[in-house]
């Protein structure tokens, strides 16, 4: 704010106050600049333009200074509790069945169905209907099981990839890969990913089928012979003394073919009745 002498000197046309009598105000900027220079020079008597002195204050726990903060904190915690209580429960839905044909799994939540579908139905081989937990394992399975050129290429180079993602090692045989998985990646010893050999089961099935076919043929022959009133004599072979061999032996029959039945090229058609003379 200007001093009254300066206002009178500026406002009147004929000022009665001389300019030299006007008081000159102190330049604060110059004074502050001088103080800053003294402080930089390291003089201890440098006076700060501020009279504020920092002072540590201590308050009790129940002081009024913390009252507003305690109220806000209490309201904040109360809102959190009420928000947890007011959270709406997920809507309950009736049980539904998996839409994949042949799967009878029931679900009451959408999350359970998504987990089931991703684990069992997302990565499924279209040839053998096997399911895999990841797309990479499915691709390796298709390459090793259903690619006709895989075995030819495996004889020339390493084709069996490691099943762990990020491990790019390849092996000559599936046994080497299995040993690598057990030793390096701590897979269980009974882990199996390669194609299983079913030679024994296939042989047993073929043997059983042959036995069944032989029994059917024998039963058919016996029925035909009984219908034609054929005479036969039962001549069982002598039974050996050993019990194990006697259990495995079966009685053999020798048949007498009637004169009305012929076999061989150029003969009369079999099972034809005699011509009347």
Swiss-Prot record:
UniProt key word 4Fe-4S: no
Protein name, as recorded: Zinc finger protein 511
Record has DNA-binding as a keyword: yes
Region (Disordered): 225-244
Organism of provenance: Danio rerio (Zebrafish)
Main location (coarse class): nucleus
Lineage top rank: taxon: Eukaryota
Function: May be involved in transcriptional regulation.
SMART domains: ZnF_C2H2
Similarity field: Belongs to the krueppel C2H2-type zinc-finger protein family.
Zinc finger (C2H2-type): 96-121, 123-146, 160-185
Molecular functions (GO terms): DNA binding; zinc ion binding
An annotated GO cellular component: nucleus
InterPro entries the UniProt entry points to: ZNF511, Znf_C2H2_type
